[in-house]
Amino acid sequence: MVEENSRVLIVLPYTPPSATLQRIIGQTIPFLRECQSQLDIVIVPEFKTSFQLDSALGKMYSITRDVLLGYGMINSGINIIFNNIHFVESNLQWKVVLLPQESTFETWKLELGQGQYHSIEHYALHDNIMEEIEGPKDANKFHVTALGGTFDHIHDGHKILLSVSTFITSQRLICGITCDELLQNKKYKELIEPYDTRCRHVHQFIKLLKPDLSVELVPLRDVCGPTGKVPEIECLVVSRETVSGAETVNKTRIEKGMSPLAVHVVNVLGGREEDGWSEKLSSTEIRRLLKSSASPTCTPQNPCV
């Protein structure tokens, strides 16, 4: 768990283009040079579609991670917060806050409390316009949504999957997390986080994004998990790599007399070169780094909160 006084916050009035974001992230490097430091990025304008969100998060997590890795900072966790202006009311405390120079953000200093405040350099309002991507307005479209995964050493790809899930869900998010006994054949299995630890990190990240959302974490012992038992579920969120499992889920639900689920595919999750991602995101790679690390207390992709 990251110490509160090691957190750094960036507030962005727009989603900046790649070169601008790289420079902004570079400005945080002096403040992040410590083990288990944490970078939170808040995007102020609301996203209207999950397609837009998926695209923006994929680019921003990838660029931010690349900059940090370029400085050898594999231990810095990243959280991108969106559609949650009330984050300033949370109990989080930031050691350093980078704000736009516009006067409209001066009042944020009162709400964010103590900390070092710096103006974002190399940033101009004309630099960026939030990318317009066609797609239905689907914020809070489903009352009850489900997703599943191992969520070992929660990383940027996991966070994109969870972020899109919270975006399309209005009331209840059910997350199946693979139980320990099904992970015995994984590489570097001795470094897999215990089930309770993985649950805690997932819960903390979801609550950071959407505090009012009801979250249910359940052990995943088969392909269907809660989707094969809970009739109220309306949508299943999957990655491209796991989309075939959705067919099995819906076949099982129909056989049991339940309605089939809408399937929402998250296009950018990690591990595929065509997405601009690489294996730097995988839980297996994180465990490999841990195994070879001379400083095991500094966890790569350290969890969010």
From Swiss-Prot:
Keyword Cytoplasm annotated: yes
Compartmental location: Cytoplasm; Nucleus
EC number: 2.7.7.3
GO molecular-function term, one example from the UniProt record: pantetheine-phosphate adenylyltransferase activity
CDD domains: PPAT_CoAS (cd02164)
Keyword Endoplasmic reticulum: no
EC class of the enzyme, as a word: transferase
Note: Present with 3610 molecules/cell in log phase SD medium.
Family per record: Belongs to the eukaryotic CoaD family.
Role this protein plays: Reversibly transfers an adenylyl group from ATP to 4'-phosphopantetheine, yielding dephospho-CoA (dPCoA) and pyrophosphate. Plays a role in the physiological regulation of the intracellular CoA concentration.
NCBIfam families documented for this protein: PRK00777.1
Annotated protein name in UniProt: Phosphopantetheine adenylyltransferase
Species for this entry: Saccharomyces cerevisiae (strain ATCC 204508 / S288c)
Gene, per the UniProt record: CAB4
